[in-house]
């Protein structure tokens, strides 16, 4: 009988949920959903000095924002330390592990000798078959795996293919430190086994770990999960991903105004492909995703592509949802609280009314907020330098005339104000653009905005007449 698929996302809480980790979580989540299985979440907090509660909170928050839910309770690796030690005791009893009393000086000498001789395996087996009665008094030993000295360790990787290591290049790795704390290599194997993990999907920087962990599985007589080591994400120039390239936490992308659906869509295409399709709904991702379609080459992060994709999602988003997302993002941006204080039932309704025009140009929620500034701005309206250049004495006189014409409009709407302005332009022998631009500058403080008649309708009669009066001169 085929076991149900169980994947896991297992971050270390030593910092934020970075973009590479987010993609790993997404791939695990998609594969579990595709196969009708579960994705578990394990926090690998065995490094007590570097693990922080703030980092744990950031990881959980990032996954929730990306809408990558996990199944069951969060597993904390450190809490399983007693179980890890229990397994080591079993291995000692079975003779697949041994106590090592080598001193720091002896280990340093072994490393130097291995380096001089060009060997990757540095530990010389000093305590591998030595009589325990030779143990020096008062020394707390480590416990090492009695790894095979000959032959090969092989991983049939779903992404990388068949990967082979010569056993004479692999050390007797430490399972338990001198203070009794389990090492990462041991803890991962025991936890994956106990959690029933069937598929391990992680970055290919863990590939060498797979060889070492396979030897632990073999020593315990446990079946190794299916392994898939996905390529890392590089910068646009092929170099290691840096903050300049996008190596930021998921929280930073939220604060930059990206939508979770857009970021998921972008991340799924970093290293995985499905023909020429670029836009995927969540349902389409789940339907199409599979491990063999992940490439072996490092994916390149491209901010411009992400921005364009985010713009697509903004343009196709429901207007009410965008207003909600716009309000939500304010808590994560500088001066967001000041903007939030200006949003009330009236301005919220204006934002909703203006959204069809606002979202056409915006690539991020921050651009959307910037475009909506004219709705929330206090009088007198701040005028951008480029717009200020439009406000010549003649233009200010024209604005006074336009205001007088608009004052006659009683039933205020985009259609009625447009009719009034077209009539004014025709009467004065002007093109509509010569009328629209002074209006735009006076009403928004900018030279670009949504359609000017939509702006008139959104702001309402009294606010428009007041703003025009602020910029008019006789």
Curated annotation (Swiss-Prot):
Keywords: Aminoacyl-tRNA synthetase, ATP-binding, Cytoplasm, Ligase, Nucleotide-binding, Protein biosynthesis. It is an enzyme of class 6 (ligase). Its main location: cytoplasm. It catalyses: tRNA(Glu) + L-glutamate + ATP = L-glutamyl-tRNA(Glu) + AMP + diphosphate. One of its GO terms (molecular function) is tRNA binding. ATP binds at residue 243. It is found in: Cytoplasm. Its EC number is 6.1.1.17. The keyword DNA repair does not apply. The keyword Ligase applies. GO terms for cellular component: cytosol. It holds the Pfam family tRNA-synt_1c. A motif ('KMSKS' region) lies at residues 240-244. GO terms for biological process: glutamyl-tRNA aminoacylation. A motif ('HIGH' region) lies at residues 11-21. It comes from the Bacteria. Belongs to the class-I aminoacyl-tRNA synthetase family. Glutamate--tRNA ligase type 1 subfamily. PANTHER family: GLUTAMATE--TRNA LIGASE, GLUTAMATE--TRNA LIGASE, MITOCHONDRIAL-RELATED. Monomer. NCBIfam families: gltX_bact. Catalyzes the attachment of glutamate to tRNA(Glu) in a two-step reaction: glutamate is first activated by ATP to form Glu-AMP and then transferred to the acceptor end of tRNA(Glu). This is Glutamate--tRNA ligase. It comes from Rhodopseudomonas palustris (strain BisB18). The lineage of its organism: Bacteria, Pseudomonadati, Pseudomonadota, Alphaproteobacteria, Hyphomicrobiales.
